[in-house]
Amino acid sequence: MATDRLTVVRVPGNGAEDVLIGPKGHIWTATDDGSVFRLTPDGHLVERVATTGGRPLGLELLGDGRVLVCDADRGLLAIEPRSGTVEVLTSHVDGTPMRFCNNAAVAHDGRIFFTDTSAHYSIHEWKSDLIEATRTGRLLVRHTDGSVQTLLSGLEFANGVALAADESYVAVAETGARTVVRHWLTGRHAGSHDFLAEDLPGYPDNMSRGSDGLVWVAIASPRDPLVERIKAGPGPLRRASAKLPAWAQPKPKRTARVMAFDDDGEVVHDRTFDATHFHMATGVREHGGRVWIGSLVEPAVAWFDI
């Protein structure tokens, strides 16, 4: 597979995990110190807009102009771009605090589809959940009246979320299972689910619907045979492996890769990049033929043109 090069844009913080394109072409990202940044379309000017007080991950636009933040520690937040005011929209589900709010997609009617990755581990122990394969992730929806409903449970590291262009389905990445699950919202299959993609070559992270109508998926790391062997083992082995110190756990292989699928699950784009200066793609956003990428571990975002 050909390896392409990315244009890397530094930000004043580490772990710019997701990327968002604003209505005027500005690029939004957020880092592990809680900062939410807005970049000019050319990436030359970076402005800190707000601080969440937690660990922001997925970013989306709300219909009222605010920026939705999936904060792994605090839940669903809304940021007013002009003032930087932060409002907590949802921090609990069924009376219990969310442990690992991760990614979201916003419907035209204001519903917010989002993931809670694990009932056992937080963002700070994400590798433990992946290794143990707790299968406690959920796909949730926040209705406009503020109520929250569980659409899917038992997901293996629930991660990225994307809506169909016609909002007939919502897709969710199961990082541990290397699949993209499609939950039907309308039509004769409403309420059921199937797969948009299976047996991916790596572990899917954040997803988004591009301006090209495709579902873009960040592939954080290639398939790891050691991780797969541990996950296939008995519960005691998985739990013991999850309790190993971070330095002793399997580490993501250094790579930078994104894929794009049509509504039939066909691969339209599969791009791998030189990972020397930017690796571990965890967020991806296409707009007008340019694709921006975020990373859980890099002090930067990056882009390429299709």
Label every PLM stretch briefly.
Residues 1-306:
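Sequence-structural signature of mature extracellular/luminal beta-sheet repeat domains
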